[in-house]
Amino acid sequence: MKYSVIIPCYNEEDNVKRLINLLSSKSDLYDIEWIIVENGSKDNTRNLLNKICEDKKNFKLVYIDQNQGYGYGIVKGLENSSGDYVGWLHADMQVSPDSMLEFIQLNELSKEGKVFYKGSRKNRKFIDNFFTFFMSIFSTLLFQTFLSDIGAIPVLFHRDLMKKFDKIPYDFSIETYVYYIAKKENYKIIRLPIYMNERKKGVSSWNRGIFSKIKQSWRIIKALIKIRLKKE
């Protein structure tokens, strides 16, 4: 298997059917496995995934009984991956799976091994850009290397990078952590523009207004400080 794409699903019962059918239609384009992590959902996501994926090829289901964070779902997906290259997407369809396929296509043409692909989000609301800018400045100062749009997806990289992970975080700070490790290990960073879609179904588990953004940013700040202190 050349590519493993991880998609954590948490309370996404309204999206999983459309998501799985779309991924299935793309499965023959590349040597790819879709690792769907049922991340301890409290709704009917797990039952729907079992039913929808029953006759789908190139799909691997990973079950987590109790949600321990977005990053934990990614980690469990990585542990169950077999691809030479690994990466991840979200299940809410705000970023089209076609974006990951663009990354894969670019990688197929590349002759470099140490490349880290990461999205760069476009057409976002002012308030979202404001928080992203602030968090990018904070992360850049904290880790003493330029880090921009730290939460952007998709992400794709060679699995050799995983050997450099140490106590990978289980929350949303995983995005910054992996990005930072890639830069520290002198990976070539390639950013591709990602045009965001509005969430059509379901609700975000955390993004429900400006106060939720503040709380989420504060949680990530504390997590990043802990990561930085461990590196000292």
Please provide the spans of the model-predicted regions.
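Acidic helix N-cap motif at the loop->helix transition within catalytic regions
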Residues: 14-18, 43-52
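A conserved acidic beta->alpha catalytic loop
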Residues: 38-47, 93
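Acceptor/aglycone-binding surface of glycosyltransferases and processive sugar-polymer synthases
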Residues: 64-80, 85-88, 97-172, 199-211, ...
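Short hydrophobic beta-strand elements that form part
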Residues: 4-8, 35-36, 63
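Donor nucleotide-sugar binding loop of glycosyltransferases
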Residues: 12-15, 41, 70, 96
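Conserved donor nucleotide-binding strand/loop of the catalytic core
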Residues: 32-33, 46-80
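Short, acidic, metal-binding catalytic loop of nucleotide-sugar glycosyltransferases
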Residues: 21-31
